[in-house]
């Protein structure tokens, strides 16, 4: 038993991860692996995509990187839709889920304000709501702290890609939910001055 050791259990093995922790956090906070508090999955693309696109306004939203604004927080609409048959070759995501770009300009987070399907240039993070306030998680994922962790695990010589398993292993601080709300309020109070 090490004093003040931070341990995690993987299978039956318990190991000290104190050396992996980048900084100290308050006693009421804890360190978590992103994959332990949410589901992380990669999108998929029906191919050839042109066979699955539709002009039908009732089609399924086809969420592409181009539907996001660099520096924006939300994806509110899509430019294209796909037919229902495309869903089985893609990944359906829900309003409130997080999307994370996983190639080229990797690691950019967005909160979904629409349901739809995502292609393989996205990772989806869902089921985080029991641990994180969505706005706190957004600011955490948009931070240089998160970006540097992603830079350490990105693969590819020319086109950089984030792997969902590597993202799941990223360590993040988890404050109590009431502290998350206070932190978000302070960030949003100060943002106009930055």
Regions found by a protein language model. Name each.
Residues 31, 70-72, 107-109, 192-193:
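Flexible loop/turn segments at secondary-structure boundaries
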Residues 64-66, 77-144, 153-154, 163:
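A short beta-sheet element
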Residues 40-44, 108, 150-152, 156, ...:
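Conserved helix-loop functional segments at active or binding sites
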Residues 8, 14-20, 35-52, 66-95, ...:
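Sequence-specific dsDNA recognition surfaces
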Residues 15-45, 173, 177-184, 192-194:
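Non-catalytic DNA-recognition/assembly elements of restriction-modification systems
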Residues 1-6, 187-194:
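Short amphipathic coiled-coil heptad-repeat segments
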């Amino acid at each position: 038993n090490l004093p003040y050791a931070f341990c995690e259990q993987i299978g039956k093995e318990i190991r000290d991860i104190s050396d992996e922790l980048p900084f100290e956090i308050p006693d009421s906070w804890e360190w978590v692996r992103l994959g332990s508090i949410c589901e992380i999955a990669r999108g998929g693309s029906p191919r050839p995509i042109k066979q699955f696109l539709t002009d039908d306004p009732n089609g399924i939203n086809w969420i592409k990187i181009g539907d996001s604004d660099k520096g924006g927080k939300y994806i509110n609409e899509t430019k294209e839709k796909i037919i229902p048959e495309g869903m089985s070759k893609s990944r359906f995501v829900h309003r409130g889920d997080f999307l994370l770009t996983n190639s080229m300009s990797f690691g950019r987070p967005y909160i979904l304000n629409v349901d739809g399907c995502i292609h393989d240039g996205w990772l989806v993070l869902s089921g985080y709501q029991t641990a994180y306030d969505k706005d706190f998680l957004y600011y955490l994922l948009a931070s240089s702290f998160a970006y540097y962790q992603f830079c350490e695990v990105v693969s590819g010589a020319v086109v950089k890609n984030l792997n969902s398993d590597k993202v799941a292993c990223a360590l993040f601080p988890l404050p109590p939910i009431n502290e998350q709300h206070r932190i978000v309020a302070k960030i949003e109070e100060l943002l106009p001055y930055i």
